């Protein structure tokens, strides 16, 4: 086995990020169980959204892939395959991307003349087994958001042109971020994100000074700063890998399942996505804390992240949707 080495710019350590616990938790849980369905992060400009997302990708272990494979395919039992290790893919989707750039293109002329399927992979192929990040997803064309969500949910990307069809694996954690001042995502699209984290600018002056100082020190000497947090980074990486291995053994009681569904029902949440995601996220949080049984505290920690964006908006209502979820949780679970 050989290792592919690339020169990458230094990434700010995930464990060095101050505050924004809600966003960090949502990202960690999605990495533990990608079937949660990704996370939408909404918040003010300059609150560390992009920095945190790149930091979680940098924290993930290397993955084994077949050499020169365009889809990051995992090794099979074929002994003739040459295997290499690469960093977990972290793909940025630019706002101006076309459908062909995202999904890939089929060379129709080559297919007709040579009788072979000539496929040029897109960003979904590159993101397979990694993270696909869309900044300002609320400004992205709805049609493209639909494609991303469909692929993230099914784990497959299908490209069809002139009667020729190609399908490949596209399993990735979809992370979207945006500023609410620039417009909201349509409710039917927002509902398809597993979690919704809301982040705000730090108001505490002492905390603000700490953030500024830490970023300044990192920019002056990135290597020294990364070494300072290496031990904490390795500990968190080990914890995430352990949770990934443990999650299949985690159980949730029928009573808790019933109460989660009761919360969703009383909040008038459309469909069953809210129920499913809350169950999954609670299991992931239990696994993250090295437990095989879900406790009330696990559900309390994740339920707002899983449900706040699924509530119908009433313009006359003054209570925040997150507070509404938390209040009902306390009534039903106490």
UniProtKB/Swiss-Prot annotation:
InterPro entries registered for this protein in UniProt: AAA+_ATPase, CHLI-like, ChlI/MoxR_AAA_lid, Mg_chelatase_ATPase-isu, Mg_chelatse_chII-like_cat_dom, P-loop_NTPase
UniProt entry tagged with the keyword Chloroplast: yes
EC number(s) per entry: 6.6.1.1
Name of the protein in question: Magnesium-chelatase subunit ChlI
Residues reported to bind ATP: 43-50
Pathway: Porphyrin-containing compound metabolism; chlorophyll biosynthesis
Pfam families named in the record: AAA_lid_2 (PF17863), Mg_chelatase (PF01078)
GO MF annotation: an example: ATP hydrolysis activity
Any one GO biological process: chlorophyll biosynthetic process
Origin: domain of life: Eukaryota
Keywords tagged on the record: ATP-binding, Chlorophyll biosynthesis, Chloroplast, Ligase, Nucleotide-binding, Photosynthesis, Plastid
Its job: Involved in chlorophyll biosynthesis; introduces a magnesium ion into protoporphyrin IX to yield Mg-protoporphyrin IX.
Cellular component per GO, a single term: chloroplast
Reaction equations catalysed: protoporphyrin IX + Mg(2+) + ATP + H2O = Mg-protoporphyrin IX + ADP + phosphate + 3 H(+)
Keyword Chloroplast in annotation: yes
Compartments (UniProt record): Plastid, Chloroplast
Membership in a protein family: Belongs to the Mg-chelatase subunits D/I family.
